[in-house]
């Protein structure tokens, strides 16, 4: 038997797939000034929400951190601030987080004159943290938890090898009195600046205002 198909009616195939998007919620340029002021480590870290919309069921949001850029800052404080400023403008004027100790003290007035939003963090050896005075133990513990939760992704950045090597030298040790101490083994003059830069940025973005860049 022949069945006549009404005019204009076409066969349609419905593909049942979940929609997935990523949204950059926040960006941070994180800087750990070099111990001797020669080459400092700067990372661009993004806080990303991955949204999955299943055909059936609730929307699933997953937050993770993605390291998308790196740069060695060379020269004196003024020269390094010029490099920070140029990068800051290029990547959309994100939050700048800097270790406020040592060479980092000199960054702040220069970057302030350039109208760069800076969040200085002073590290100490205690166990509790305030807004700007941060315990190294808490900061590194926070980074360790994120890695254990697989919430950090390292992109194809120029200094990926240096960052990974620095993170691999990262150690947590329990002392006899029960305190947890973190350290980074120095190798050929490299003091773990890349790992410290990573930990600083992750700490700075753990809370605070969200700067929505949009889904992509």
Protein language model features and the residues they cover:
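RNase H-like, metal-dependent nuclease domains and their acidic two-metal-ion catalytic environment used
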Residues: 1-123, 130, 137, 150-216
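Conserved RecA-like P-loop NTPase helicase motor core
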Residues: 133-136, 140-142, 146
